[in-house]
Design a protein with these regions (language model features):
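A polyanion-binding, active-site-adjacent surface
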Residues: 15-134
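Generic N-terminal amphipathic, Lys/Arg-enriched alpha-helix
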Residues: 1-19
Length: 134
């Protein structure tokens, strides 16, 4: 599986910025490198964080390092996993801190509601393969 780098679903500043980068030699090199990779690359939509949290609605930014390295877990939002997936250790730790400091209890790993509320959940590396970053 190869990620979809189309910018059609991006709006405003995100779309302009990403399209500018993708047209640059560095952006083209990145896409070529990932396209030529023989392993599966995920998440399927690496710009999902930018799609779900328009620039004008960003209220907080939470950076992750890179997508989860297990197929099916990486969903394009830092720390988030698709509904029904087992919570990864990093997300369990976040939930423990939330419970201890704010008495907020959370058990599901789909954080799309955080993105809708203005939380930009952005990994500093947008794509990965099984067991590695790309």
């Amino acid at each position: 599986m190869k990620p979809d780098f189309s910018t059609e679903s991006l709006t405003g500043v995100w779309r302009t910025t990403v399209e500018h980068f993708m047209a640059s030699p560095e952006g083209q090199n990145l896409v070529d490198r990932i396209s030529s990779c023989t392993a599966d690359v995920f998440p399927p939509h690496p710009f999902r964080a930018l799609e779900e949290t328009p620039f004008e609605q960003v209220r907080a930014v939470i950076f992750g390092q890179d997508p989860y390295h297990t197929p099916g877990k990486a969903c394009g939002l830092a720390f988030s996993v698709p509904a029904g997936e087992k919570l990864p250790p990093s997300l369990k730790n976040i939930f423990k801190v939330m419970a201890a400091s704010n008495e907020i209890r959370r058990t599901r790993g789909d954080l799309s509601d955080w993105a809708a509320a203005g939380g930009l959940l952005l990994n500093t590396i947008l794509t990965g393969g099984a067991g590695k970053t790309l």
